[in-house]
Every structure is written in C-alpha cells, then in structure tokens.
Amino acid sequence: MAFDYKKEYKEYYQPPKKPALTEIPPMHFLAVRGKGNPNAEDGAYQQALSRLYGVAFTLRMSRKAGKNIEGYFEYVVPPLEGLWQQNGSPDGSFDYSRKDDLSWISMIRLPDFITEADVQWAIAEVQRKKQLDCSDVEFFTYDEGLCVQVMHIGSYDSEPETIAQMTTYLTEQGCIADHSETRIHHEIYLSDPRKAATEKLKTVIRIPVKRI
C-alpha cells in the first residue's frame, strides 16, 4: 500500500478543531512563488498549480520513466499547501477584500528521499513530455518551528473567525504570533474545492508563534 503522509503524520495533517501549539520539523517541498488573486481564472496561481502538480506526479511516477531514485517507495502525493502574505500587512493579518495584493508560495511536500537533483530531472522531464516550462518550480526547505494550528471547516473567506480563536488561545498560552519574511501564515488544503461543498472544506491553518 502506498505511503500516505496524511494518515502517517496525523499530528500535522489532521489537527483538532480547537487551536493547539505544535512544533513542526523542517520539511522539503516543491514550491512555486507568485503574487495575485488565487481565485483569478487562469491567473498566476492556477497556472502555478499546473506546474507544481506536473513535477509532483512526474516524481511519483519516476520508476515508470526508468528513473532510479535511491530509497524510493510508493507514496500518495501529499496535499497542496500554501504560505500567504499580504502587502502592507507585516503583522500577518489579511484584508480579504484585497486578494490582488497577496503574495504566496504554493507547495507540495516531498518524501525525504527526493533530492534537488531529482527535482531538476522531473522539471526537465515535464518540459520534454508536455512542453510545459516548470523552471520556476524549486526544491524548498521550510523550517517552521513552534506554531499554533487548527482544523478550519468551511469557506476560505470565513477563516478570520477561526484565526480570531487562535489569537485568543495564544494569549491564554502566553504566546504571540511571530510573522516575518521566513515565518509565514501557512495553510494545508485537504479538500478539493471543485468537488466538496464550501461549508465542508477542510483546511489546516498554521500561524508561527513565539513565547513571551
């Protein structure tokens, strides 16, 4: 049976619906950086996802292409993730009416056996087979550290209510949010918005924190 990160690491992908502090270890990702409204039809964000998934599935199917990756085992491609910032909001807050001002890093987790050289091979393979330029897809290591996380159920636009609960929890725990250029609002998308009802969408929300 293929290794499924969502099931094997439930502490990272299936948190409770109430906020909790957790320490996240460094992980490797495929990543694409961009700016703009993620809801724009055929916009930069949607195009980035095509490149990201193209490389992710090429790596997963590498054996069938004759690529021998040391330590390879069968796995389920992990869920889409995103790091989000908004121009003019150094505290990490969001004005959901200004989605054009968003900056994002879209990511898919990589198994530890995947190297940067393997990613470069997959990028070239996608270019060769699909004539899709994936040169902006990068091997990205994110060292998240101490965070508060929660399972948000519902619309992405209703996230402020959940984030308010997280902020209250942090105050109770003697912590504050700790946003910076390297510690960023993080979301993991467990539902496909094209298939799931809006009120049932599952999104892991993580906010970097520090103790005071």
Go through the PLM ranges and name each one.
Residues 1-212:
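A solvent-exposed interaction/effector surface
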